[in-house]
């Protein structure tokens, strides 16, 4: 019988990471104890409480801990953003490089900014099929449906009802 219990314990040990032969002691302090009182943190907890014991509003906390760290030495405000480093310090060769931006040709500029009406035949050499929006545009608008379609017929019927002088909405009594 003793042998059977030992085999059972061995079987449990092979499946679980708990040693059945070891005796575990209860930890101290227990999580069930009042840890604030045990470690003397109750006065700090009361100073940070949002409500007092009588239910009235306590100290309104700021979103920062500025009030709580004022007694510590040093600066308590964040210094403004970093100042930009001049490009000459980052790459000294930039200052030695010549300015390579050239002026635009005035004639080219005037031709490029001339606004004329588009010819009746459209812009020469321009094909709207190259943009690949022609098919999608007609699908979005519904231009590709003929009037004999199911949806086209419904639209025309609704228009005819409205044209006959009858109100298409129901009147509630």
Swiss-Prot record:
Xref: Pfam families: Rox3
Source domain of life: Eukaryota
UniProt keyword terms in alphabetical order: Activator, Nucleus, Transcription, Transcription regulation
Positions in coiled-coil regions: none
GO molecular function: transcription coregulator activity
GO CC terms: core mediator complex; mediator complex
Subcellular location: Nucleus
Annotated region described as Disordered, given as residue ranges: 139-173
GO biological process: regulation of transcription by RNA polymerase II
Keyword Lyase included in the entry's annotation: no
Location, primary (coarse class): nucleus
Function: Component of the Mediator complex, a coactivator involved in the regulated transcription of nearly all RNA polymerase II-dependent genes. Mediator functions as a bridge to convey information from gene-specific regulatory proteins to the basal RNA polymerase II transcription machinery. Mediator is recruited to promoters by direct interactions with regulatory proteins and serves as a scaffold for the assembly of a functional preinitiation complex with RNA polymerase II and the general transcription factors.
Family affiliation: Belongs to the Mediator complex subunit 19 family.
Protein name, UniProt field: Mediator of RNA polymerase II transcription subunit 19
Source organism phylogeny: Eukaryota, Fungi, Dikarya, Ascomycota, Saccharomycotina
């Amino acid at each position: 019988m003793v042998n059977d219990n030992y085999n059972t314990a061995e079987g449990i040990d092979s499946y679980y990471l708990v040693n059945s032969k070891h005796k575990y002691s209860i930890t101290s302090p227990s999580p069930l104890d009042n840890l604030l009182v045990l470690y003397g943190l109750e006065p700090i907890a009361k100073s940070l409480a949002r409500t007092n014991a009588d239910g009235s509003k306590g100290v309104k906390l700021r979103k920062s801990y500025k009030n709580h760290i004022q007694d510590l030495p040093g600066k308590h405000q964040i210094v403004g953003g970093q100042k930009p480093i001049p490009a000459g310090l980052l790459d000294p060769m930039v200052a030695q490089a010549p300015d390579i931006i050239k002026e635009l040709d005035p004639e080219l500029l005037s031709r490029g900014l001339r606004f004329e009406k588009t010819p009746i035949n459209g812009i020469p050499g321009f094909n709207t099929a190259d943009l690949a929006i022609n098919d999608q545009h007609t699908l979005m608008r519904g231009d590709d449906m003929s009037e004999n379609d199911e949806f086209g017929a419904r639209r025309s019927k609704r228009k005819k009802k409205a044209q006959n002088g009858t109100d298409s909405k129901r009147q509630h009594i």
